[in-house]
Design a protein with these regions (language model features):
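Extracellular adhesion/carbohydrate-binding repeat motifs centered on closely spaced tryptophans
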Residues: 2-184
């Protein structure tokens, strides 16, 4: 069982143990404190702005999702909740926001590329996406396509600025129809 070394005022510990709250905050102290053995609480524990989740037996949850209300949170190998990062599990990529919640039905910008998290939270890949009346193509890496792209034997152009598919317009000296397909 992993031990957390933190400082905690005796009054703070007594107050935490008396509340029965699922959210526990361990403050600064000079002793070695094991939140599981000390509090025997289940639920969320805040250790100096690092969040952990303990099951009904007081064990830290690791390498899995925690469902809390309408949100899911990824608990890392060390038991800490992931924040503002990619999570790769079961062959899929997910994004968790700054609060640690799994993102869904939302665009995520990372390193100059745009990615779309579907309704189930997975990064969409190798697929068309219609979003608010605009079409996009999400590549094998999940990044939204930019520039010319051949798909199914047809050529399409995706704007560099917002990755949207051009349609019924001229792209340089080339024309694309209402469906975005290059007209030779």
């Amino acid at each position: 069982m992993k031990r957390f070394t933190k400082t905690m005022a005796a009054l703070g510990l007594a107050a935490v143990m008396g509340t029965g709250s699922a959210f526990i905050s361990l403050a600064d102290v000079t002793t070695s404190v094991n939140p599981v053995a000390t509090s025997r609480k289940s639920g969320w524990v805040d250790v100096q702005n690092h969040w952990y989740y303990f099951d009904a037996n007081g064990n830290p949850v690791k390498n899995q999702w925690i469902q809390d209300g309408n949100n899911r949170y990824w608990m890392q190998e060390d038991g800490e909740m992931s924040k503002q990062k990619w999570v790769y599990t079961e062959g899929q990529w997910y994004w968790v926001n700054a609060q640690g919640a799994q993102a869904s039905n939302i665009w995520v910008e990372d390193g100059g590329s745009w990615y779309y998290m579907g309704g189930d939270g997975r990064m969409m890949t190798n697929t068309w996406l219609e979003n608010n009346g605009t079409w996009y193509y999400l590549t094998e890496t999940g990044a939204a396509a930019r520039g010319w792209k051949e798909l199914g034997g047809k050529w399409y152009f995706f704007n560099d600025s917002d990755c949207s598919m051009a349609n019924d317009t001229m792209v340089g000296q080339y024309r694309v129809d209402a469906n975005g397909v290059y007209i030779p």
